[in-house]
Amino acid sequence: MELNLEVIQREVIKPSSPAPHDRLQLSVIDFGIAEACVPMIFFYNLADLAEKSPDIVSTRLRSSLSQALSRFYPLAGKKEGVSISCNDEGAVFTEARTNLLLSEFLRNIDINSLKILIPTLAPGESLDSRPLLSVQATFFGSGSGLAVGICVSHCICDAASVSTFVRGWAATARGDSNDELSTPQFAEVAIHPPADISIHGSPFNALSEVREKCVTNRFVFESDKITKLKIVAASKSVPSPTRVEAVMSLIWRCARNASHANLIVPRATMMTQSMDLRLRIPTNVLSPDAIGNLQGVFFLKRGPGSEIEISEVVAEFRKEKEEFNEMIKENVNGGHTNTTLGQKIMSGIANYMSELKPNIDTYTMSSWCRKAFYEVDFGWGRPAWVGLGHQDIQDGVMYVLLVDAKDGEGVEVWVGIPEQDMAAFVCDQELLSYASLNPPVLI
């Protein structure tokens, strides 16, 4: 359902206590994706809340954000070249209102309307000069609900980092004791090598070389359908595939089929998946809550005439992940430095980047599952729904993002591909036998 908003106020929120005035060095990965952001929207049902006045709720959000920024102080800084100046410049907080009821909006989700729940650039503001963190609190009609939209610069945070920050902010809003709230490790160059402006003059843009602007759609895989898909995805080498392996393999197959439906001459295709280093490196080396773009990648490729069989892709998925995990294990147990490990991870990323070509369909896939986004409770309960505002964030990138469904067992998949491909993709009967296209969220 189309959403019309009225912006009530916009202000800069500074940390409640001064931050150390130092600089945070960006890694090669941070700098390379500096123009992208991580956009998320948390929807809350306030219908049964006693104190649901927008003024009261907004004050709590703003006050707790100021306190949270004292711990996550680089988010209140400014990107300058290949570093973050921790200068307490602050985050931008916008308050908006709509007459539409939350239940009405969630029953008929308009994918294109989601992006207006994410903070936009101010007049005269460029991608490079925007705040590292922007927040928008949108109040729905008759006190029915609230959407907290956040946009965090990708130069400082990946999805796991955003989860750590938002859960920390929410804990502050709930009034948790300071003993439970610690300052996280900002580990931008703990693994990956630092960016050098003389070498990395500008963020890389190879991912934007696709045929046309991408459009986004949402697909929901319920747990029972995932169970059936896993049976198809299983093989002798991988008898028990994960839901992420099975769903990503199906999506790649269907996206490739949609692309071929619009081409006279078939194209080669490639998919890449990022892997969270926090889950693979010992905690004495890297904190599970470390902030940064702490990812490695692997990729799979198919020629123009090759078929994409789900079980075969899953087997390759598993093999690549196991080899990646073994490489990390050997480096850590062998006493090698983080620099050595970072160089090996970067070598894999460089191999992937060298494969990016305009005549190859490349799908950038990430799993944001198990990131505890449904645990973000500001004091009025857990989210009724967590959505993404990923339209127009980085034009030209074909992406697939997996997030948990609210029950923790199903998966919501956000797919961004060229419009003509999407027209065929949403009609793929194999896909629709496992997934529902943008179903309502009932509260």
From Swiss-Prot:
Family matches, as InterPro entries: CAT-like_dom_sf (IPR023213)
Tissue expression per record = Expressed primarily in the root epidermis.
**Active-site feature positions:** 154, 377
Briefly, what is this protein's role?
Answer: Probably involved in the modification of desaturated thalian-diol.
Gene name as annotated: BAHD1
Question: What Gene Ontology terms describe what this protein does at the molecular function level?
Answer: acyltransferase activity
Q: Which residues form a coiled coil?
A: none
EC numbers: 2.3.1.-
User: Belongs to which family?
Assistant: Belongs to the plant acyltransferase family.
A Pfam family found in this protein is: Transferase
What more does the record tell us? Constitutes with three contiguous genes an operon-like gene cluster that is involved in the thalianol pathway.
Q: Does the keyword Membrane apply?
A: no
Protein's name according to its UniProt entry:
BAHD acyltransferase At5g47980
For this UniProt record, the keywords arranged alphabetically read as follows: Acyltransferase, Transferase
